[in-house]
Amino acid sequence: MKIVLHPAAVADLSAAGDWYERQRPGLGVDLIVEIERALEVIAESPTAWPRWPDAPTELEIRRVLLPRFPFALPYLIQSNGIVVLAVAHEKRRPGYWLRRAKRRKR
């Protein structure tokens, strides 16, 4: 299934990658590699992952948790593909990205 990253998710990813890279060279690259793997898993089986607990029931929003980093990838399943809504830190600003899904609802 086709996957696209919401433009704001690209910004999330860039900010997180830059932060980790400043903490230790190579760590930002590790984050990006882990996210790429998660995207492959989502594409292979988008409905295998749990629904986002606080998402509106009318939206098909699911999530993948990254095993090594404290991030989740919330994604919206649509008839024409999957939209990754955010690279969301698990402990910061819960649900800040939900408005991105509401704007994309089709």
Predicted region positions:
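Enriched for short, Lys/Arg-rich terminal
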Residues: L66-R106
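Short alpha-helical segments used as structural interaction elements across diverse proteins
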Residues: E21, L59-E60, A88-E90
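Arg/Lys-rich, positively charged N-terminal/basic patches that mediate binding to nucleic acids
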Residues: M1-E34
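Acidic, low-complexity intrinsically disordered regions
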Residues: A15, S45-A48, R93, R100
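Hydrophobic recognition helices of helix-based DNA-binding modules
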Residues: A16-Y20, L39-I42, P46
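Short, hydrophobic secondary-structure boundary micro-motifs
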Residues: V29-D30, P50-P53, Y96
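Basic/aromatic recognition patch in beta-strand/loop cores that engages polyanionic ligands
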Residues: R37, E44-I82
